[in-house]
Amino acid sequence: VCKSTFSYNAGLAMIRRTAESDIVRLRKYEIPIKRVARNLCLDPALIAGIISQESRAGLLLDNGWDQGRQKYGLMQIGRQQHQLFGMWDSEEHINQCSTILVLAINEVRARHPTWTWDQQLRGGICTYRAKMGNYQVYEEDPCDRDDYYVNSVIRRAQY
């Protein structure tokens, strides 16, 4: 019991520390994030939370690419799945990825109309990440068993 409590609390502290340090880098993108969020009816904090989780607001990127050169940009779009638009840190890139997020959320809402909004949002975030939406049963986090990705994005969005 103590070990899992410690791990959970340590994880929360780590997310808080990284989110706080990412806020400084995210300020550079505040205006494009807010513009995209307004146009797509998204909470700008959700976009910022994904940017923080995926690329640490650009800190983890090499000229816009992840280490394996498979994902691109602040929101880490896979080059196999999508045509890339704009520079890695541009409003165009943020708009492209945020549009994919909105489509993912709407797909989950259509497939699971009885889910709560929180469940649909979590499923949409997961679908954005995993590029899949084949959920038959809702669990705490359909992304993975330890709830890490979706919970991390949501917690980062709260900072």
Question: What is each stretch, according to the model?
Answer:
Residues 1-11, 19-27, 38-40, 68, ...:
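Non-catalytic cell-wall polysaccharide-engagement segments
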